[in-house]
Amino acid sequence: MRILLSNDDGIHAPGIQALAKALREFAEVQVVAPDRNRSGASNSLTLESSLRTFTYPNGDIAVQMGTPTDCVFLGVNALMRPRPDVVVSGINAGPNLGDDVIYSGTVAAAMEGRHLGLPALAVSLNGHEHYETAAAVTCTLLRALAREPLRTGRILNINVPDLPLEEIKGIRVTRCGSRHPADKVIPQDDPRGNTLYWIGPPGEKLDAGPDTDFAAVDEGYVSVTPLHVDLTAHSAQDVVTRWLSSAGVNGQW
C-alpha cells in the first residue's frame, strides 16, 4: 500500500510523526505536509504565488507556506511517483467534530485526495496525549481497506478519544453534530497602541444527539463519519423553485 500522508498542524507536529512511524511498519509512506501550522486553512489553494518544497534526509517533504490542500495536490500530482493508493491526513491535535469540518485543514487535505480520485481518511485525536491510540486505529482501518475496499466514494472523518487503546470501547458510524455559532473575538493592544484581534474558541455543542460524532467520542468510541463533497441541499431545490415562482423572480427574464 502506498500512502500519501499530510496534515494541517505542520510537518513537525507529534501527530503526523507518530502516524508516519506506525504506517511505515506495513506501507510505503510519503509525507508531504505544511512547513508550519496551517490549522483552519480549510480547502484554500495557493494560486497567486509559487510553492517551494524542502526534502528532509528521511524523504519527508515540507511545502513552504503551503496549505494542506496544496500539499495533497502536489503530492498526488507531482511528488509521489507512482501515485498513492490512499491519502491520509492527521493525526490532528484536537477533534474535528460537527461544524469543525467546514474549517478543518485536516479534513480538507482528505477532501482533496478524494477530489483527485483516491480513498481518503482524516484522523483527529480528541486531545493531545494518546497519539499512539489514534495511530493504531488508523492502521487497523487501512489494513481493513486493503483487505476489503470501501467503494462509497466518501471521505472517512475519524475522531479518536484521547484514551489508551485498551480503554477504547469500539467504533461507531456517526453523523456530524453541530455547534452553537462561535462569536468570541479577543482584542489586544500591541506595543504601539494598535488593536489586534484574535478569533476565539469554537462554539459549544448544539446538536450532540446519540448518533453524532460528539456523542461517540464523549462515550469512549471512535467516531467514523462518511463525508461527501457535494454541498447541494437537494431537499431544498423544490422549495427554492416554488419561492422563485411565487416571488415573481422567474417572470423577469
From Swiss-Prot:
Q: Which UniProt keywords apply?
A: Cytoplasm, Hydrolase, Metal-binding, Nucleotide-binding
Q: Which family does it belong to?
A: Belongs to the SurE nucleotidase family.
Q: Where in the cell is it found?
A: Cytoplasm
Where does this chain mainly localize? cytoplasm
What is catalyzed by this enzyme? a ribonucleoside 5'-phosphate + H2O = a ribonucleoside + phosphate; a ribonucleoside 3'-phosphate + H2O = a ribonucleoside + phosphate; [phosphate](n) + H2O = [phosphate](n-1) + phosphate + H(+)
The protein's name is: 5'/3'-nucleotidase SurE
Obligatory cofactor(s): a divalent metal cation
| HAMAP family named among the record's database cross-references | SurE (MF_00060)
Q: Which gene encodes it?
A: surE
Q: What does the record give as the organism's lineage?
A: Bacteria, Pseudomonadati, Pseudomonadota, Gammaproteobacteria, Enterobacterales
Keyword Membrane annotated: no
User: For this UniProt entry, what's an example GO CC term?
Assistant: cytoplasm
Matching SUPFAM superfamilies: SurE-like (SSF64167)
